[in-house]
Each structure stands twice: as structure tokens, then as C-alpha cells.
Curated annotation (Swiss-Prot):
This is Carbamoyl phosphate synthase large chain. Residues 540-916 are annotated as: Carbamoyl phosphate synthetic domain. Residues 910-1047 form the MGS-like domain. Mn(2+) 1 binds at residues 284, 296. Keywords: Amino-acid biosynthesis, Arginine biosynthesis, ATP-binding, Ligase, Magnesium, Manganese, Metal-binding, Nucleotide-binding, Pyrimidine biosynthesis, Repeat. Mg(2+) 3 binds at residues 813, 825. Residues 1-398 are annotated as: Carboxyphosphate synthetic domain. Composed of two chains; the small (or glutamine) chain promotes the hydrolysis of glutamine to ammonia, which is used by the large (or ammonia) chain to synthesize carbamoyl phosphate. Tetramer of heterodimers (alpha,beta)4. ATP 2 binds at residues 701, 738, 740, 745, 770-773, 813, 825. It comes from Thermoplasma acidophilum (strain ATCC 25905 / DSM 1728 / JCM 9062 / NBRC 15155 / AMRC-C165).
Length: 1047
């Protein structure tokens, strides 16, 4: 059947900023969809507010709108672009929910818009839990018992539920948001009351808990002809009760019998066909002793779709887009083999293991995992055996366990970690095996199948009884099991790099196999590779190519922005005539799409695996600038192992001088460049002494970290001692830096060739200095930076380029106070702000950087901003109920959104995505004088003002009337929490003293704002900016290129 000719201009809706439960996988699926539809001759328009994505690049879609993902924006785009079809299945829950709103609002009907792919009715049937329950019931499919708790009948409905524990779920939600397993009625009652207070939902869905059963997933794809295949099935090591996004997942399933496999496959196809799915979807089952229950269906591409695509090589999103265009599976060629069709189910002769990456190294919160997601990213390991795939996944995590799987806790604590779902459970089981714990008991407590624990025992036995100080004689056998050199090092006491060199000298090296969707039955056109210690090597000739290493798993401070840089660098190399190799371990990303680079090696991003690929491929150069801190920290080690210079761009010697804060600060001092007063501390006592010498407040900064890890503004001497102790656990020395109060921070990205440079743009933080650049609200636009400050910055950049011979991209962070410019830090790599400034200027800065690395010169481009571009961070606070909404020098955000405008007020207004008619003000004493003018502005714009008692009195003394609200402990009404819960307040301005009591007082206010999605402004400068933006501000939605033309 030919492609559909009843549609011509298609709007693809993206997923917006990265949040927990919705991350880089939707950049991957959305990019694939756009390219796939354009291949068919359709005019593709993209809407996505996330500038860090590849899909918002002009190479992906014909027209790109980096605008809020709202009904209002979509309607305006429909009018402007004459849209006749919308593809909402590639943008996660955000796009799917928006499609339903567009239908319910009548916009689809009014403009004659078609939803291509799975119909909206099918989406609603799968997403609405009540409708889905009735659908499964009519089909005779088994499902857990279902109950409902209504807003107005909480006590009655909770009392009527016969079986506890239960699982609480909400409809149309993301990453299990609002979900939880509840063990008793009292907790269920409390949870229901909290959820109803924090949202506008009318009822809660409550299901029988299936805790302990196996969780199995099938990735299914179906066309409009009724052809339906399962791309793969996936087995969760963690049992039911742990969200699949939180679980360790193996593909293909390892413990199912053929009868069980076929039973679930048949059920999946029946259900997907019954729903009328046209495209990709994911279905989840609970399984125990031949019995199964249907849990849910995701009627769209998902996190699991990206994982299945990378695990099998089957490009699910690309095929789903072709189906949306009208093709059948029997008509679509498999792009990996280029000879078979998409109707063939993939066949695997290897194993993949996915492990989530949690942010518990950033957040001191409860490490228990459950039905609501907490992980930020994930990694995947590929091997010929489960053991090999598991160990490669562990190596890819880039955390403490990547170099040592031992867990040093007492036995009773170890049993607790084995029995309770948490991020360390698999390492607790490893440790239990080292201590000869009973396998059956560990299986019973954890829910892990004995099969997996026995496989883990093989790893433990290979590591036992190594002689300290000696490389094991049976090294080849250990490597065949899949154990990385870093972990071998921990058990034999020989440095990992020494082991790697030893292997190279004795030719104990891996070969590389191809992922081909067909277990080698057909010729493969694409080199998608993984390593294993066997005999036959399938690596193509890649001599003279250039390798780019990715940034590994998404995590706070190192996420999608770096994948953007990696992909753009690959495309630049291709345009320049160079072949490229990509090495990465993240299954969510565009960079690990098999046809982005000339060869993809899906391997851990560690020195061992990078060196292995370099030696096997014969590549001529290595680019580490787009791998975040990961690449910076390993660059020198890679060159030392190889015994030669191979890193392109800034030299590893310069990188080391810049990354060591002590050395860097002294170099800057020698250059005569201003920096905040500082001292170098060698231990905890020295830290306290030098901090007191500088005078509080101060900031402690450690070396070789990203995202300001462990950094914090410290006002209190007792707290200083505690923080110093924690930092010296990860750092040999600490830079004690005076905190510059009332300064403005700026980010300066620039490209240089070692002598000349071009500044990409100067981005100004709206908040005062002290908020991490990854968390700050930032703006780029005309007239933002005074001319005299620009000239001083240019002078500093020139000095840096010449001193460190910077080649490629670099990022300089500065603070400006009283006309003076102070250097905070320099990063000799691409930064988080590079995608943002690239979209704001319309210039491919990554390409210019790669040209410099290859040997070209850079011309100084003086950028003249034409419009305003606002960068707003997105935080994960809603997922961590015990985490306060307070930010500072250590980064906490998961993603970002960009809001362009012809004026700054327009950009700010877009970022609110709601009208503001009432504001609650509650600020600390030192901010009260500054809040007066802000309150007056709000009042003049017709905004109703509320305030807490102290703030209300202060404003009244300055002639500004407010209505006073009270805390619960005040025992007076109206109460703050009630007013926020009732929807009477549209925005909250809250600053707090950084003392335990003050933070605790504001905690509930901040939490309920986060849960209800109410704008929470925690900085006076930012409050002023938003106050000035309110009122009659004209808002329009434009293609990103149009903002570059507006003067």
C-alpha cells in the first residue's frame, strides 16, 4: 500500500524537558520519527521546548518550534503552518496527554486535524484505568482486583477494600507519579488525603498488590492491516512492586518456559489488536507459576521502546512512523539488514542487561525504590552471557560499584538490603554470595529468581582468593566471564591500567560481534558492535577514523546536553569527510542510534573499553569534549595506557591543570585575573581555619567533579566542619572560596584554536551568584551585558586561550560585582549551555569546535542577539517526598526548557504557562526591604497579594495591603496550605534563612507548590523579573529561525 496522501504537513510533538520517567529516549524516538516521515516526503514541523535535544536541530525537521508544549501553542502552530496531521506518540506522556486535550477541546475537529498512528480513542482506552479495566474484563484477560477511592467518600471507600496491601495508581501519569504500595489502612487513608489535597483528581485507582510476582514486558508493534509482532520480551530481575524503570532488566527473558513465553506473547498480541494500536506499544505482565495478570499498556513509544530498539537493533520509532504514514510491516525494509522486512521478529544470540542510574549520590533521600520512579538514567551492557552483560552494565554506571562490587556492612544490615527494594540490592546479593549466604533465602527475600543469583555466583567465584599484588594467572577465563579490569584491580591490588597494559602485551583482547536483528542469518549493512572474549572478530576496517566517546548514563549535571554535542560532532565529521566511531553505554540516546556514526560500539565509557576499541579499530583520533566530566577524567589515563597522544583538542596536560582547582587558582592569580578570595585546605581542620580567615559565607569546591558535587554556600561554622568531612571523603584537597554576595553570574561559551577565539554568547543568570549554572534561570539577549563588561570578558577569554592553549569548545563561569569580573571556573569541554546558545544564535558551534580540533583556524564572530532566550531548569522534587526545594552551588535539576521572546517579558510570560492573579509572599528578613517594590509592581498589575504574618506586617508598614495567611501551628485561619490546596494562589514567592528551623517552616509550603504545579519563586531577583513580566504582555509562537531575524 502506498503512503497516505490525505495528509501533507505533520506536527510532531516532543516530550519537553528531561524529567524523571521521561528522558533522552524521547529525543531518540522523536528524531527517528521526524527523519522517517521526511523520507516519505512529508513536511514535518516539530514542537519541543527542550533545546538540548537533537530533534530541535534543523537537520531533523523542516520547521522547529522551541515553544511551550501547550494547547494554545499547538493551535497557533496549526494556524501558521497549515497542519493537517499530528503525531503525538513520540513525545512520551506529555505529548499523549496533549493529544487528548486537543481532542476534548474540539481543536482537532475545528481544524480537521488527523491523529496519525494509534487513534486518540485507543489512547484513552489504554490510559484511562477504568476504561482499560472494563476492556480487559470484556476480553476475559486476567487482571488484579480493582477498587476506587472517591474524593468525597475517602473513609467509606478505604474501609470497604477487602485486601491489603494494595497499590495506588493514577491515570494518564508518568513514571508511576502518585503511585505507591500501601501496607495498611491507616497509611492508605493518609495517602489518599494527601493526594487529593495535592491534586484536582476526583478518584484514586487502587489495585490488588501483586508484590513478589515476576514482571515481564513485551514490546509490540502493529500496523493498520492487523499485522502484529513482538520485537522482544524483557524480564525484570526485581519482582512486581518495583517500577520497570527502576528495575534491572534482561533481554531476552532468561527464566520463562516456552509455554509461558508463548502464553504471554499470545495475550500481548490479542490485547494490542483489541485496542486498535497502530504503531509501537509496551505491555506489562505479572507472572507466577504459569498464572499471569495484565498490568498495563503504554500506547506509545516509551523508555522500554528505546531499550528494546538498542537491545535488538530493530528501530521501533522509525518503523512506527512508517506505519503512521500508512505502510504495513510487510512493506517496510529493515534498515539494519536492508534485505529483510519489518514483519520479521528479531532474533538475538546475545544478552543485554539494563541497570538504572539513581541520583542518590546527589540527594540525601530515602533510597527505597518502588512503583514510582526515582532514577534519572540507565545503562545497558551487551554480552554473550548474562554474566558478561551484567558486569558491563555495572562498569557503565560510573559510580563506586563500577570499580568494586563489595558492600561493607554488617550481616543484619546486608539481609535488610537484600529484602528491601533499594538501589544497592544487587550488590547486597553479591556481598551475600561472598559471605556464603543461602541462595534460596536470598531469592525468597529479594524476589530475584535463583537462576540469576547462581549466575552471579559464577562472577563471585571467579573473584575469590586472588593473590594481592599479582595479576591472576587465569585472567583470560576471568575476562570471558565479563569482569572489567577495574573490578579485577579491587580484588588483586594491581592498578587497573596496569592490568590493561598487561592484557595488551599478552594479546588478551576482546573481539567484536555485530547486532543484526537476525542472529547472523543475513548480511548486515550496519556495524553495530559489542565486545566479547571469543575468537572470531567482525570489526570492519575503521583505520583513520575518529572516535567520539559519549557521556554514559544520564545523571544530574551530565545529561542530554552532552549527547547533543556528541551527535553534532559526528555529523560535522561526516560533512568534513571523516569516518566516525561512537562509543557509549546509554540506550536512551540519539548517539547510540545505529546509523548516526559509521560504527557504533555499545560499550562502557571507561579507559579499558575505550582503549580496546582504539586498538582494534585503528582510529586516528579521540574526541572527549562531548562526554562531560567522564571524558575529562579519563583522557590522561587513556593516553598513558596507549603510550601516545591521541586526544584531539585541548591537551590532556592542560585539562589536568584546569581541573585541579588548586593549580588553576594559582595560574589565574599569576595571570592577574580577579577571582574570589581563596585558600587551599589540606584537611578538615585546615578547612575550618582558612574559612574563618576568609570570613563566612564561603563555598567549598573539590576538583574533577561535575554539577558542583558537594558544593554549598556555608554560613554556619558548625555546619562547615560537617561538610568538610564529607568533601574530604571524595577529594584530596579543597578550594575554600569566599562567596561573592550580590554578584551576577554569567556563563561564557567559546570556541578557540589555541590562539584565536570566538565567543558563542554570554548568558546571564537572573538569580544572584551562588546558584549552580545548571539550575539557574538564565537569559541571552540584546543589551543584557554592558559593553565594558563584555570587553573585560573578552580579555579574560583571550588570556585563558593562550595560557592553556584551548582548542575546541570551552566554558568560562564568571561573577560580576561593582564593575569587576571574577573568574569562578573554566571547563575545557563542551558545557550544558552549548545546545541552548547554539539554538539562540543559529550557529553550529560544535561544528566549528570540531573544525578547530582537526586543525582549522577560528574567526572571531561577534554575536548580536536579536531576541531574548530564557533558559529555565526543571527539578525532580515531586519524586522525592522527603527532599526540600532549596538550591545552591550543587546542581539538582534534571533538565531544561527554552522560552524565546521578542522581549524578555514575553519569554518570562511563556515560562509561567498560566495566568497569575494571586501571589503569596513569604520572605526572610534580609529580603523584606527588596520585596516592597516587587509587591508594589504586582499590586499595580491587579494581582491579589497574600503574605505570612511577618511579611504582611512589613509590607503594611510600607503602605502595601495584603491578606495574612497562617501556618498550621498558628491555629488561625485562613491557613496557607488550605489556600494553596484550594487553588486560590497562583504563584508563591518564598525565600528562607538557611537555618534548620526556617527551612523546616517553609518545607510544607514548598512541597505542596511542587505537587500542585504552582510556580515557586525562591529568589528575589527572579521574583522581580516575573513581576515585571505579568500583565498585558503580547505572546506569540514562532519558528526558532524567526527569532534570529527579529530586531
Amino acid at each position: 500500500m502506498p503512503r497516505r496522501d490525505d495528509i501533507h504537513r505533520i506536527l510532531v510533538i516532543g516530550s519537553g524537558p528531561v524529567v524523571i520517567g521521561q528522558a533522552a529516549e524521547f529525543d531518540y524516538s522523536g528524531s527517528q520519527a521526524c527523519l522517517s516521515l521526511r523520507e516519505e516526503g512529508y513536511y514535518v514541523v516539530l514542537l519541543n521546548s527542550n533545546p538540548a535535544t537533537i530533534q530541535t536541530d534543523h537537520r531533523i525537521a523542516d520547521r522547529v518550534y522551541i515553544e511551550p508544549i501547550t494547547v494554545e501553542a499547538v493551535e497557533r502552530i496549526i494556524e501558521k503552518e497549515k497542519i493537517d496531521a499530528i503525531e503525538p506518540h513520540m513525545g512520551g506522556q506529555t505529548a499523549l496527554n496533549l493529544a487528548v486535550k486537543l481532542k476534548n477541546s474540539g481543536i482537532l475537529q475545528r481544524y480537521g486535524i488527523k491523529i496519525i498512528g494509534t487513534p486518540v480513542e485507543s489512547i484513552e482506552l489504554a490510559e484511562d484505568r477504568e476504561k482499560f479495566y472494563e476492556f480487559l474484563k470484556a476480553m476475559g484477560e486476567p487482571q488484579p482486583a480493582r477498587y476506587r477511592i472517591r474524593r468525597d467518600h475517602i473513609d467509606e471507600d478505604v474501609a470497604s477494600i477487602p485486601d491489603i496491601p494494595v497499590i495506588v495508581r493514577t491515570s494518564f501519569s508518568l513514571g508511576g507519579t502518585g503511585g505507591s504500595i500501601v501496607q495498611n489502612r491507616q497509611d492508605l487513608l493518609a495517602m489518599a488525603e494527601n493526594l487529593f489535597r495535592a491534586s484536582d483528581i476526583d478518584y484514586l485507582e487502587v489495585n490488588e498488590s501483586l508484590e513478589g510476582m515476576k514482571e515481564i514486558e513485551y514490546e509490540v508493534i502493529r500496523d493498520s492491516f492487523g499485522n502484529c509482532i513482538t520485537v522482544c520480551n524483557m524480564e525484570n530481575l526485581d519482582p512486581m512492586g518495583v517500577h520497570t524503570g527502576e528495575s534491572i532488566v534482561v533481554t531476552p527473558s532468561q527464566t520463562l518456559s516456552d509455554i509461558e513465553y508463548q502464553m504471554l506473547r499470545d495475550s500481548a498480541i490479542r490485547i494490542i489488536s483489541g485496542l486498535g494500536i497502530e504503531g509501537a506499544c509496551n505491555i506489562q505482565f505479572a507472572l507466577s507459576e504459569g498464572r499471569y495478570y495484565v498490568i498495563e499498556v503504554n500506547p506509545r513509544t516509551s523508555r522500554s521502546s528505546a531499550l528494546a530498539s538498542k537491545a535488538t537493533g530493530y528501530p521501533i520509532a522509525r518503523i512506527a512512523a512508517k506505519i503512521a504514514a500508512g505502510y504495513g510491516l510487510h512493506e517496510i525494509k529493515n534498515p539494519i539488514t536492508k534485505s529483510t522486512f519489518a514483519a520479521y521478529e528479531p532474533s538475538l544470540d546475545y544478552v543485554t542487561v539494563k541497570i538504572p542510574r539513581w541520583p542518590f549520590d546527589k540527594f540525601s533521600v530515602d533510597r527505597t525504590i518502588g512503583v514510582q520512579m526515582k532514577s534519572i538514567g540507565e545503562v545497558m551492557g551487551i554480552g554473550r552471557t548474562f554474566e558478561e552483560a551484567l558486569m558491563k552494565a555495572i562498569a557503565s554506571l560510573d559510580n563506586a560499584f563500577s570499580s568494586n562490587i563489595r558492600l561493607h556492612v554488617p550481616d543484619d544490615e546486608l539481609w535488610r538490603l537484600i529484602g528491601k527494594p533499594n538501589d544497592r540490592r544487587i550488590f547486597a546479593i553479591f556481598e551475600g554470595l561472598f559471605r556464603n549466604f543461602d541462595v534460596k533465602r536470598m531469592s525468597r527475600l529479594s524476589g530475584y529468581d535463583e537462576y540469576f543469583i547462581e549466575k552471579m555466583r559464577n562472577i563471585v567465584e571467579a573473584l575469590r582468593n586472588m593473590d594481592m599484588g599479582r595479576i591472576p594467572e587465569n585472567l583470560l577465563r576471568i575476562k570471558r566471564i565479563g569482569i572489567p579490569d577495574e573490578i579485577i584491580s579491587a580484588f588483586c591490588g594491581v592498578p587497573a591500567d596496569t592490568i590493561t597494559k598487561y592484557r595488551i602485551d599478552r594479546n588478551i583482547m576482546p573481539v567484536y560481534k555485530r547486532i543484526d536483528t537476525c542472529s547472523g542469518e543475513f548480511e548486515v549493512a550496519v556495524p553495530y558492535m559489542y565486545s566479547t572474549y571469543e575468537d572470531e572478530d567482525e570489526t570492519p576496517d575503521l583505520s583513520g577514523s575518529i572516535m567520539i566517546i559519549g557521556s554514559g548514563p544520564n545523571r544530574i549535571a551530565q545529561g542530554l546536553e552532552f549527547d547533543y554535542g556528541s551527535v553534532k560532532a559526528i555529523l560535522a565529521l561526516r560533512d568534513m569527510g571523516y569516518r566516525s566511531i561512537m562509543l557509549n553505554s546509554n540506550p536512551e540516546t540519539v548517539s547510540t542510534d545505529f546509523d548516526i556514526s559509521d560504527a557504533l560500539f555499545f560499550e562502557p565509557v571507561t579507559p579499558e573499553y575505550v582503549v580496546n576499541v582504539i586498538r582494534r579499530s585503528g582510529c586516528a583520533g579521540l574526541i572527549v569534549q562531548f562526554s562531560g566530566q567522564t571524558g575529562q577524567n579519563m583522557a590522561r589515563r587513556i593516553e598513558e595506557i596507549l603510550g601516545k597522544h591521541i586526544v584531539l583538542g585541548t591537551s590532556t596536560e592542560s585539562i589536568d591543570r584546569i581541573e585541579d582547582r588548586t593549580v588553576f587558582s594559582r595560574v589565574i592569580e599569576g595571570l592577574g585575573i580577579k577571582q574570589p578570595p581563596f585558600a587551599i585546605a589540606e584537611n578538615e581542620n585546615d578547612t575550618v581555619r582558612k574559612a574563618m580567615g576568609l570570613g563566612l559565607p564561603i563555598i567549598l569546591r573539590s576538583s574533577h567533579v561535575i554539577g558542583g558535587r558537594s558544593m554549598e554556600i556555608i554560613y554556619d561554622v558548625d555546619y562547615l566542619a560537617d561538610r568538610a568531612r564529607e568533601i574530604f571523603a571524595i577529594s584530596k584537597n579543597v578550594l575554600v572560596s569566599k562567596y561573592l554576595e550580590n554578584a551576577v553570574e554569567m556563563d561564557v561559551d567559546f570556541v578557540s584554536d589555541g590562539t584565536s577565539y570566538s565567543i558563542c554568547g554570554i548568558i546571564v543568570h537572573i538569580e544572584e551568584a551562588g546558584v549552580h549554572s545548571g539550575d539557574a534561570t538564565m537569559v541571552y539577549g540584546p543589551g543584557i551585558v554592558p559593553v565594558d563588561i563584555e570587553k573585560k570578558i573578552e580579555g579574560i577569554v583571550g588570556s585563558m586561550v593562550r595560557e592553556f592553549r584551548l582548542i575546541g569548545l570551552s566554558n568560562l563561569q564568571i561573577a560580576v560585582r561593582d564593575g569587576d569580573v571574577y573568574v569562578i571556573e573554566l571547563n575545557a569541554r563542551s558545557s550544558r549551555s552549548v545546545p541552548f546558545i547554539s539554538k539562540a544564535t543559529g550557529i553550529d558551534w560544535v561544528r566549528l569546535a570540531v573544525e578547530c580540533m582537526i586543525g582549522s583556524r577560528i574567526e572571531n564572530k561577534r554575536m548580536e542577539a536579536k531576541s531574548y532566550f530564557l533558559k529555565v531548569s526543571v527539578f525532580p522534587f515531586s519524586k522525592f517526598s522527603d527532599m526540600d526545594v532549596v538550591y545552591g552551588p550543587e546542581m539538582k535539576s534534571t533538565g531544561e526548557a527554552m522560552y524565546p521572546g521578542r522581549t524578555l517579558a514575553e519569554a518570562l510570560r511563556k515560562s509561567l504557562q498560566r495566568s497569575i492573579s494571586s501571589v503569596l509572599i513569604t520572605v526572610r528578613d534580609e529580603d523584606k526591604p527588596r520585596i516592597v517594590d516587587i509587591a508594589r509592581i504586582l499590586l499595580e498589575k491587579g494581582v491579589k497579594l497574600y503574605a505570612t504574618a511577618g511579611t504582611s506586617k512589613f509590607l503594611a508598614d510600607h503602605g502595601i495591603p495584603t491578606e495574612t495567611l497562617y501556618r498550621v501551628r498558628d491555629r488561625r485561619e485562613p491557613r496557607i496550605l488550605d489556600m494553596i490546596s484550594s487553588g486560590s494562589i497562583d504563584m508563591v514567592i518564598n525565600t528562607t534563612e538557611m537555618t534548620a528551623g526556617a527551612v523546616r517552616d517553609g518545607f510544607k509550603i514548598r512541597r505542596i507548590c511542587i505537587m500542585r504545579g504552582i510556580p515557586l519563586i525562591m529568589n528575589i531577583n527572579l521574583a522581580r523579573a516575573y513581576a515585571e513580566a505579568l500583565g498585558q504582555v503580547e505572546v506569540d509562537y514562532r519558528e526558532i529561525g524567526d527569532y534570529l531575524q527579529v530586531s
